[in-house]
Amino acid sequence: MDHKGTDPGFMNPVAGFGVTFKAMFKKRLTEQYPEQQKTTAPRFHGRHQLNRHPDGLEKCVGCELCAWACPADAIYVEGADNTDEERYSPGERYGRVYQINYARCILCGLCIEACPTRALTMTNEFELADSSRANLIFTKEQLLAGLEEGMVDSPHAIYPGTDEQDYYRGLVTEAAPGTVQQVAHSKGEVVQEGDSTFGATEPASEEVIRR
C-alpha cells in the first residue's frame, strides 16, 4: 500500500481520543470537597495546640525554643515569671504571649520537635483559610487546649506537696480538691465583690481591691 499521499498528522486526533477513552474507565480520584471530607492521617500536620497538665496548668514554659526552630519565623513567644498569686505552669516561667502566624507557617513540625515539655503538638484541623491576614495570627487563647474533666483553668496553685518534676513524672492526674482559679492580675483582672451586691462582670470597689 502506498502511504506517500497520507497526511502524517491524520492519526494524531485518534491517538489523543485513545488516551481519553482509557481514562474514562479508570477509578476516579476526585474528592467532592468540602461536601465529602476525607479522614486525615493520625499524625497529620494541622493546626497547633498548646497542651495542659492533667490539673489544667499549662505545659508551655516560655522557653522560645519553638520560635528559634521555626524556619518561617511564624512563631512569637514572650515568657514571664510565675508567682504564687498567679501561676500558669508548674515551673518558674510560662508563656505570657504566644502567637502563630499561619500566613507564614509551613506546617513542617520542627517546632514540635524542639519543644522540651510536649507543650506544643499539631492537630488534624487543616481548614485555616481566611480573607484577612490579621485573622491568620492565632493567639494563645485560640491555641490553648480546652478543659477536660478534673481540670481547673489557669492560673491556679500547683498540686499541694508536689513540684515541677512530679508533673512530668505523671504523678499529678487531676486538680487538687478545692482548687480555685486565681485572679489574673497580669491580664487586668481585679478582685470581684460578692454576687449578692455586684454582678459577675462589674468592677470591684477600691475598698475591696485594697484588702
UniProtKB/Swiss-Prot annotation:
Binds 2 [4Fe-4S] clusters per subunit. One of its GO terms (cellular component) is plasma membrane. SUPFAM superfamilies: 4Fe-4S ferredoxins (SSF54862). One of its GO terms (molecular function) is 4 iron, 4 sulfur cluster binding. It is an enzyme of class 7 (translocase). Residues 50-80, 96-125 form the 4Fe-4S ferredoxin-type domain. This is NADH-quinone oxidoreductase subunit I 1. It comes from Streptomyces coelicolor (strain ATCC BAA-471 / A3(2) / M145). The gene is nuoI1.
